[in-house]
Amino acid sequence: MVNIRNIERSEVEEVSKLEAICFPEAERASFARIKDRVKRAPEIQLGLFAPTQHTSTLIGHVLTSRTGSETVTHESMSKHDSKGENIAIHSLSIHPAHRKNGYAKKLIEELQFRCQHTITPKPSRMILISHKPLVPFYESLGFKNLGPSECKFGDETWYDMTHKI
């Protein structure tokens, strides 16, 4: 049985390694960026852990920040506004060996639950950018597609997505 909990500072290297497995270099968060997010907003950085014989192993994560922006911007990716009314999802990663088990959905649902019940101040919405093939997945979780994003990473077109809480 998997466990979702906040990522600890001591786990940043493990998170960075998973990020490197899951994203091409142009799209992944740097070690420094991950470390900064975990330091500034540990309550909204979630890890998905699978039990092993003596401990647990990180198999997924969702990395976020707070922002006043209603869509993800380059600025919102590099800053955390502790008073921001929105949660910007920057990375949803599941190790390739553990995909197709509903774990990405579990992470988003847990983040949404925490946004509704434990995170203060309570956010208004979750926002993210997505590649076109993943838009239907996020729509199935209640996100609305706002169309092509102004954010550019690599050669792909990204789509702004929003989910009111």
Swiss-Prot record:
Pfam families the UniProt entry points to: Acetyltransf_10
Domain N-acetyltransferase span(s) in chain numbering: 2-165
Keywords: Acyltransferase, Transferase
Regions crossing the membrane: none
GO terms, molecular function: aralkylamine N-acetyltransferase activity; diamine N-acetyltransferase activity
Catalytic EC class: transferase
GO CC annotation terms, alphabetical: cytoplasm
Superkingdom field: Eukaryota
Entry EC no(s): 2.3.1.-
Family: Belongs to the acetyltransferase family.
Official protein name in the record: Uncharacterized N-acetyltransferase C9.02c
